[in-house]
């Protein structure tokens, strides 16, 4: 999996940072998932190497404008391209009314299947939000001024590595049968032998996991959702010195994000959703917030627009390669 940040500012865009949007690229299935869609997100797509035509799912954390104002336009542009097989959207209860209200009043026609799935019930009861053969998505309620949800994406365990040398020693002819054996299936060869694929594969390999957590003040629910994740993307709207304001506005400080990462035992933390007050040249900058977080959780990096991170299933804090 690969994460690309398309917007890392909170509230309003700046010259260097657009408002919230994070893309999750799934190259093994040529799909793209999007988490939040602030105003201008489709412009960020144009400036990146991401293909909007691959967009398949959108997960919205909450209904504040800096997380949703870009959604109607992006979906409309996708419709004009004529290349979408359909998009599923997940988010708070008002998402459906908001989206279809904008599309209706602007006489915008979406020429592809569009389905909206409220996540409140699943998030509050611990049920799965989405699942297929390869991936699972869960959500949990956060502590914010409006209903908000964090999301976790888990790759399911993959079959162990296939021992080609052992297969050759058993005189198993290469070809389609290898694919079945790699999946752990039992196959019958032309000579009548039955071969159990599990006997030719190593132990199952753990899949990667990504958690997207915004907007919220520190809460235990976020810790539980993020437990053991390879990558935690967490809002860091304020510095530690502004903790009182963070509590009032139900946002996180850099140290709250780091505390969540430390308690959850994640491999790497990325700070995002940064207040414009920390722009370069100000008394306190985003690099100061990074230093505050690293004092608690050293494996922390600072998000910037178009930063890409390859997420691999490891416990080593250096597991995630960024570019």
Curated annotation (Swiss-Prot):
User: Which keywords does the record carry?
Assistant: Endonuclease, Hydrolase, Metal-binding, Nuclease, tRNA processing, Zinc
Comment on bound cofactor: Binds 2 Zn(2+) ions.
* Residues that hold Zn(2+) 2 according to the record: 66-67, 215, 273
Query: Residues in the active site?
Result: 66
**A Pfam family assignment:** Lactamase_B_2
The GO terms this record gives for MF are: 3'-tRNA processing endoribonuclease activity; zinc ion binding
> Which cofactors?
Zn(2+)
Entry's CDD domains? RNaseZ_ZiPD-like_MBL-fold (cd07717)
**Reactions it catalyzes:** Endonucleolytic cleavage of RNA, removing extra 3' nucleotides from tRNA precursor, generating 3' termini of tRNAs. A 3'-hydroxy group is left at the tRNA terminus and a 5'-phosphoryl group is left at the trailer molecule
> Which residues does the annotation say bind Zn(2+) 1?
62, 64, 144, 215
Q: What InterPro entries does the database record attribute to this sequence? A: Metallo-B-lactamas, RibonucZ/Hydroxyglut_hydro, RNase_Z/BN
Q: Which family does it belong to?
A: Belongs to the RNase Z family.
Q: What does this protein do?
A: Zinc phosphodiesterase, which displays some tRNA 3'-processing endonuclease activity. Probably involved in tRNA maturation, by removing a 3'-trailer from precursor tRNA.
* UniProt xrefs under HAMAP family: RNase_Z_BN (MF_01818)
Give the protein's recorded name.
Ribonuclease Z
**Gene that encodes it:** rnz
